[in-house]
C-alpha cells in the first residue's frame, strides 16, 4: 500500500483554517466582508470575551438561498467567481471560497439567513459536521453566530493572546473596514458594551472622527489625485499630528484594506522633512484602479497585494501629498480649549494642586534686541515675572484593553495642535460622550483647511528668550521661533542645492580608509563597484574581505568623509544599490546642523530680522530637516482668551 494518501475534507478544512482563521479577528474580518459583498447597508458585530467565546454578525444583505446554504460550507465554493478570467477582474472582498468551511471546522456555528422572498434557513454546524438544518421564519439578511472558537484545536488556543489584545486586533480590523466602506453602518459591541457606531452616510471624515476623535478630524488634509491608471482619495493629518507607530496609516485598494509597506513608505515620503524621526502621520488613502493592475490572490488572508505599476503609483502618492502641503501654512497653533475641556482641566488642576508642592518662583531672562535702542551695543537682560507654580505633567498611559502588546505607543506630552488630543479617545469615542448625532453635527461644522499657499507671512521681531527662542508678531498674533531650527532649514536648502550641483570630482585622502566586511557583504559590494565609481567612490581590494578608499567625492562634508563612506557601504549591503540622492540629502542635513546658530546665542535685532526674512525665502519654512517645528503661533484671539478679554 502506498504511503501517499488523499486527506479527507474535514482534515483539509482544519489545515486550511490554520491559514485563514488565525485568531478571532480573522473570523470577524471574513464574516463582515461577506456581509459587505452581500450588499449590506447595516452590520452589527457582537462579541463575548473578545470573540473567543462568541462572535455574532447580523446584516441586512441579500441573504443565502436554502439550496446554497450547505454548498456555501464546502471548500472552494463561492458565488463571486466562475472561471479563471474572473480572477483578474475581482471587485468583491471574498472570492476563494475558504472562509466559511474553515471557520465552521474549528467552531460551533449557527446560521439563520433569508433572501426575503422565501422562508429562511436555520443551520447548525459543529466542527465541520452539520448537526441541524431546518426552515425558519427570518427577515431578509444573515445572522451568523460562531461560538467556542478552536474548541477542537486546543494547540491553537495556546497561541491566543489576552482578551484585551485579541479585542484590540478585532477593533483594528473593524476600524479599517469602517474607513474603507463609509457607506455601510457598522456597530461593534463587546460584552453588550458599544465600542463603535458609524452612520453609513458615506462621509469618511465622520468615520475618522468616530475612530480617532473630532480633534484629529479637524486636522485632516484632503488628498485627491487622478492619472490614467489610478484614482486616489483620502485624508492625511497635518505634520503636527503624529503617532509613534505606522499602524495609523490605512491603505485601501478597490475597497479592500491591505497592508502594504511600500504604500506607507510613499505616504511618509510625501511628508519628506515635515515629520520628526520616528513619528508617523494618521492617514487614509483609498486607491481605485483596474483590477488587472493588482493581484489580490497572494495570501489566503487577502491582506497582501502586488501591483503591476507600483513605481507609478508610489510616485503619484508622493507628488500628491507634497503638492497638498505646498498649499497650506503649516504653522502649529497653540490653541484654545473648549468649554468641556476647560472644565476637565480645571478639575485636574485642582487635583494636582492638592498633591503637589509649589515650586519656588523663577525669573527667566528675556533679552531685547539692541536694534530697539540705537545707543545700546550689548543685549540687555530684563527680568520678567512668570507664574509662580505649574502643575506637574502627568504621563498618559493608554488603556491596555485596546492596545496591541507588540506596539509601543508614545504620544507627545506637548500640546501641539489647536485642541490637545486625548489619544484614548481614538479607541472609544462614543464612550467619551460623542453620540452619533452630535458627532455628525461636529463634523459638519469642521472648517476646511485653507489652501491659500504656504508662504510664511511677514514677521516683526519683539525679542529673544534665553538666547534660543525668538518672539515675533504680525496682525495674526504672536509667533515663537526656534532660532537653531530656523537657520538649520535655511542652511539645509543652501547645502542641498550646492551638493546636488557638484560634478564628479574627487579629493585624495591623506590616510587611506580601510573597510573590513563579512564575506556576504564583500560580495555584494564587489557587485556594485562600477556603480560606486560613477558617484566618485573608488574602492580597491585589500586582502581577502577588505577594501581601501584612497579618495572621495568633493561633495562629502569636511570631517564626515568616513561616516558617508560607511553609510554608502551600508546602503549597498542592505539595498544592493547606491541611492546617491539620499546620501547627498543626508550630507546636506549634517552640514546644515553643524553650520547653524546654537541655543544660548544672543542675536541683535538686525540679525533676528535678517534671519526671519531669509526663512521666508525657503521652500518649507515650517520644519527643520529633522522634522521639528520651527515656529508656533498664538492667535490674537487666543491671547485675549487667556486674559479673559473675551469669554
Swiss-Prot record:
Mind telling me which InterPro entries this protein's record contains?
Answer: DNA_mismatch_repair_CS, DNA_mismatch_repair_MutL, DNA_mismatch_S5_2-like, HATPase_C_sf, MutL/Mlh/PMS, MutL/Mlh/Pms-like, MutL_C, MutL_C_dimsub
Which Gene3D superfamilies does its entry note?
3.30.230.10, Histidine kinase-like ATPase, C-terminal domain, MutL, C-terminal domain, dimerisation subdomain, MutL, C-terminal domain, regulatory subdomain
Molecular function terms from GO: ATP binding; ATP hydrolysis activity; ATP-dependent DNA damage sensor activity; mismatched DNA binding
A GO CC annotation recorded here is: mismatch repair complex
Annotated region (Disordered), positions in chain:
375-433
For bias type Low complexity, the affected ranges are: 387-400
- Short name of any one Pfam family annotated for the protein: MutL_C
Gene Ontology biological process: mismatch repair
Keywords, A to Z?
A: DNA damage, DNA repair
What this protein is reported to do is described as: This protein is involved in the repair of mismatches in DNA. It is required for dam-dependent methyl-directed DNA mismatch repair. May act as a 'molecular matchmaker', a protein that promotes the formation of a stable complex between two or more DNA-binding proteins in an ATP-dependent manner without itself being part of a final effector complex.
Name the family: Belongs to the DNA mismatch repair MutL/HexB family.
Q: What name does UniProt use for this protein? A: DNA mismatch repair protein MutL
Q: Name its species.
A: Bacillus cereus (strain AH820)
